[in-house]
Amino acid sequence: MKAYAFGFPKIGEKREFKKALEDFWKGKITEEQFEEEMNKLRMYMVENYRKNVDVIPSNELSYYDFVLDTAVMVGAVPERFGEYRGLSTYFDMARGGKALEMTKFFNTNYHYLVPEIETEEFYLLENKPLEDYLFFKSKGIETAPWVIGPFTFLYLSKRNGEWIRRPNQMEKLLESLVSVYKEVFEKLVENGCKEILVNEPAFVCDLEKAHWDLILNVYRELSEFPLTVFTYYDSVSDYEACVSLPVKRLHFDFVSNEENLKNLEKHGFPEDKKLVAGVINGRQPWKVDLRKVASLVEKLGASAISNSCPLFHLPVTLELENNLPGGLKEKLAFAKEKLEELKMLKDFLEGKTFDLPNVSFEDFAVDLQAVERVRNLPEDSFRREKEYTERDRIQRERLNLPLFPTTTIGSFPQTPEVRKMRSKYRKGEISKEEYEAFIKEQIKKAIELQEEIGLDVLVHGEFERTDMVEFFAEKLNGIATTQNGWVLSYGSRCYRPPIIYGTVTRPEPMTLKEITYAQSLTEKPVKGMLTGPVTIMSWSYYREDIPEREIAYQIALAINEEVKDLEEAGIKIVQIDEPAFREKAPIKKSKWPEYFEWAINAFNLAANARPETQIHAHMCYSDFNEIIEYIHQLEFDVISIEASRSKGEIISAFENFKGWIKQIGVGVWDIHSPAVPSINEMREIVERVLRVLPKELIWINPDCGLKTRNWDEVIPSLRNMVALAKEMREKFES
């Protein structure tokens, strides 16, 4: 029995990766010093592997993103970056003004840079797999280089702004791409490499027979090399085609669902290759029941075990956590502990005897009363009392807003002063009273500024919040937050996913104090600001023994209690942010109806407000076409969307959907850019939307929250936005 592992987090126990990378960007350290820091992290990762598994991956420490590394390897550097000059060009592609687009890696919370393919000829530009292999070999460590496979690389790429996913688009490009991979693999083998770990997660996507024909051709071309092909995040789309590939070993994910297992039982597994069973969950931080997993491995007849998917979706180690709720720590395993589980599982399968940990969750942190409430929800819990047209009439009378009402999405700049005061409060250097007085002062300034600029619907600014999910996690029962449970989101940006470990309930109001204070300062409506249940769940870890639907409904009920408290306090508009509504959808579209049924119900349960309360939803993605029918079923009154990058073209989704009657907040300002948008640029977007929607349905707002921007960018941009709204009103009212 062999133990494999892959995708160990590169960030270091104390985010050493982030510090070194940002210091290098700021010019505080030289390239040589940066490389030294990276080498320390490389050794740390490999030492953890060496203690626990048999096959040690190399080429796993990317300086920004492993898909970007692959693009550089095969010479896919867009012309606008000029001649490739090492790290300076590499980081220009990642984060300069001309940077590549960034999007989610499959349905995970990791973001990758989308390669832009401008040519049909690839060539070997930089052989990082070989460099890394030789780095470890020089230290006497034999490794197996980890690479993104050619099919997945192309599947994740775009040409002229469109995905390269149709078989006829891929065929010629794959031929050229494979020649580069051949060259890379030849050089590795020439230098003594005995195994190459090729990652092909795209094999689990909705692929046609023509795709599998291409994949078979690719791997016939590469059949002379010692390849282990890894698939993960779901079951492979065509099991029989996949197991027929001429490779030495195949890794399947047996954690995400049971389809790979069912296919293996039905069709068997070929004798000419070995099965690597992905049985230790790489996406959730729970300890496994090793006896149960061992019996699955035996049932599979696997000759090797591994994690189900990359471990970089987990924090580095549990060792630094000292403040978790009682009984929780012993039920958890982060990346380092998952490696230890693999070692323990291998030892157990080889007949070694020892006490296995008890990981029973049966009655852990369960609130039976709350569970029963969720299980017995009446059907009308998921529908508002009146239909939208009736609600709209009531709300227009109550709010009396002008045409083209203006608002922002919620957060205002978190200045160094705000962050410093929060840090002081958390360290106990200032009292709760001092901190709350400071927050009140920030809210007062924000309300005064919005009044002066002339916005129609105001926000309190969210100065008391670090993160839109962590803020609520800290206030809800059944959710724990960590001290050092950092996970990489993209580049050097890390976040700490909360852990949903028990029944989720709301012990007391979470946002009432700040929102009602803000409302007391103005006659204009101030929005209540809440994060939706699907996003709280999607950006957290959650129990595997409780159905996802049930967890989402528990959170939704807690959010709905907050909505009701805000209504009671006289708040007329409540916004529920659901950026994860689309991204949590399964990879395979055949599973969408089941997911969207409970995701829609969860939002509607949270949003079940009085008819006179205007519910806003905020979703910041750029492609609504695929999910417009599901969005239409959500019980909001206004939805705000990102429209600036597409110059308003996103509205085509609503144009093609017959019967759209709800209001839309059009994002006219790309908040990811420091540039102040001109009135002309904003007007162009609104005019595009007016070709589709009547003027009565249009709101004007930025794309997203303004937390990461500076006040000197925010104020002129908001002034331009309000000036545009006034201009549009005059045009239509004259």
From Swiss-Prot:
CDD domains: CIMS_C_terminal_like (cd03311), CIMS_N_terminal_like (cd03312)
InterPro entries: Cbl-indep_Met_Synth_N, Cobalamin-indep_Met_synthase, Met_Synth_C/arc, UROD/MetE-like_sf
Residue numbers binding Zn(2+): 618, 620, 642, 704
Function comment: Catalyzes the transfer of a methyl group from 5-methyltetrahydrofolate to homocysteine resulting in methionine formation.
Organism: Thermotoga maritima (strain ATCC 43589 / DSM 3109 / JCM 10099 / NBRC 100826 / MSB8)
One Pfam family hit: Meth_synt_2
EC assignment: 2.1.1.14
HAMAP family: Meth_synth (MF_00172)
CC cofactor: Zn(2+)
Residues that, per the record, bind L-homocysteine: 409-411, 462, 577
Residues reported to bind 5-methyltetrahydropteroyltri-L-glutamate: 15-18, 104, 493-494, 539, 583
Pathway, per record: Amino-acid biosynthesis; L-methionine biosynthesis via de novo pathway; L-methionine from L-homocysteine (MetE route): step 1/1
Example GO biological process: 'de novo' L-methionine biosynthetic process
Protein name, per record: 5-methyltetrahydropteroyltriglutamate--homocysteine methyltransferase
